[in-house]
């Protein structure tokens, strides 16, 4: 897509790319946050020169917690088609205007921490056949405070210890021939986490309502 001839409706077909990108000099390439900025700027009626001069993947009007999570998640997806499907126009259009006060930002921060400990980590523990550790983390109460995080420390440290041992054993045993099989085994977990991460973003967005 070329910025000079770009129309708002064209952005629904924009491929969401990995990493940050320079301001468009003709061809438009954008990560999820940059695409969210571009959609917002065009809806505001900005001219092309202003879009270029203020191009950003960190919109001031976007919650820093949501922005940071989206950037990290965006770059963790290796497939352009999967990334573009997950960061749909509807999701991108919800990113601007999400910045709130410190209390709202803290609630969203705890939501992200809770997701990482009770959902993301158990998924990878199961890949290492550490079912007991995965179940222990999933059984933790929702983590929404320093006290809850402190109470989760023993289960987290146990999972981290066993997970480190499993990673070391896997690296020692892995060979070139196992690469494809390992990728196949990982795919369902990655797919499930992508859906779960999208749900987290939508919950963080809804937290202000």
Regions found by a protein language model. Give the residues of each.
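Short, glycine-biased loop/turn motifs at secondary-structure junctions and
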Residues: 1-175, 179-209
């Amino acid at each position: 897509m070329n910025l000079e001839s770009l129309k708002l409706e064209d952005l629904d077909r924009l491929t969401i790319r990995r990493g940050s990108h320079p301001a468009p000099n003709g061809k438009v390439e954008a990560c999820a946050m940059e695409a969210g900025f571009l959609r917002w700027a065009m809806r505001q009626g900005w001219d092309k020169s202003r879009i270029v001069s203020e191009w950003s993947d960190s919109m001031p009007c976007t919650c820093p917690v949501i922005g940071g999570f989206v950037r990290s998640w965006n770059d963790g997806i290796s497939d352009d088609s999967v990334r573009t499907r997950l960061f749909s126009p509807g999701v991108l259009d919800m990113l601007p205007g999400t910045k709130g006060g410190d209390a709202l930002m803290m609630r969203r921060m705890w939501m992200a921490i809770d997701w990482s400990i009770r959902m993301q980590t158990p998924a990878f523990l199961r890949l290492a056949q550490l079912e007991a550790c995965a179940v222990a983390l999933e059984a933790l109460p929702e983590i929404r405070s320093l006290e809850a995080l402190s109470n989760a420390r023993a289960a987290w440290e146990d999972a981290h210890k066993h997970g480190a041992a499993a990673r070391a054993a896997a690296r020692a045993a892995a060979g070139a021939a196992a690469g494809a099989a390992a990728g196949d085994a990982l795919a369902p977990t990655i797919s499930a986490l992508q859906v779960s991460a999208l749900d987290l973003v939508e919950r963080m967005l809804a937290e202000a309502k």
